[in-house]
Structure formats: C-alpha cells, structure tokens
Amino acid sequence: MSTNKEEEHQIVCTQDFLRQYYVSESVSIQFGLNNKTIRTINEEEFNNAAMCIMTRTNYPESTLKRSASTYLLNSYHKKPATLSLPFVFGDTINLSEDMEDNNENNLLYSDTLYGDDSLTQRGDQVVYKIDTQEEDSSFTLLQSEANETRPLSSSSTPQILQSDYSVVMQEGQTSNGSIFQFSSP
C-alpha cells in the first residue's frame, strides 16, 4: 500500500469512527461542537469501525473488541465516561511493527473507564514520539468521551489509566480539526 493510500485510509478511519460510529451527527460539546449526547451503535457499525482500526494497527480482533465492547455494552449510558481504545496511527509507517514485543504495547490496551474528567487544563496538540530508528515515527492514542449536560466539576481530578498515558480527544475550532491531548503521570 502506498504512502498516499495509507494517509487517505488513516483520515477516513479517524473521522468515520470518531464522528459517525460513536456519536450522533455532532460530537459532544466537550469536543467543541453542539451535541451533548452519545448514541449506541449497532453491530454492523461496530464491526465496520473495528475493521477500520484493525486495518491500520494489525492488532488482533479480540483485543480491539474487548476494549470497545466494554464501552459499548456497559458504559455508554454512564455519563460522564471516557474510553481508551487501542488506536495507533503512524504518520508515515505502521508502528505496530516497530512496537511488536515491546512493553510499550501496554499503552495501546487500556480500556479503563473513568468519569468526571475536566478537559480545561489540556491544551496543545500532541503526537507522542517513539524512540525508533525512523525519525518520523509517531503515534497518537485516541479516546472517545461523553459527558452529561451538567457542567464539569473544576475540582475533578483525572485518574491515570492502566497505561502510563491517558489521551483525550477534543475538537478544536481550527477548521474543525481534531486536537489530540494527553496527560502523563
């Protein structure tokens, strides 16, 4: 697959999964848009989204479904809630090959849910660089988050997930692009 094809698929996967499969027409107000609700998705939509991610990451289907189904079946109605899914999007290469048999794989498998996490202190776009031989190698962990219509508590403290990094996606107003943000211990 050519680089152009990979980049095209990466964009489609990100937008289709986060904007269509997990949310209604507009994503949560926490992402900078207007709709505060998150909807369930049917089995066909979930399978399409799962296949889209697996195509990019080459991770086993069972790993993806364990994380995603935990959210879809048990937690979508518990608001606020945050889900960490095993997304990996490389800028120029498929990083699953570079990270194979590496303890850093644990970063990709966190499906711990936590609630009432304020996004107000998270600002800049982040692409976390991995120390590999490829200078352009990078990955971004994505999360899908939904909150109740009530205001977020400014005193709430986000809990660190099972992995070392917790990454939250928030929509920015720069041409409606996505800003991927992270917090580390």
Curated annotation (Swiss-Prot):
It comes from the Eukaryota. The gene is REC104. It comes from Saccharomyces pastorianus. Residues 146-168 are annotated as: Disordered. This is Meiotic recombination protein REC104. Potential transcriptional regulator that is required to activate expression of a number of early meiotic genes including HOP1. Keywords: Activator, Meiosis, Transcription, Transcription regulation. Pfam families: REC104 (PF17378). One of its GO terms (biological process) is meiotic DNA double-strand break formation. InterPro entries: Rec104.
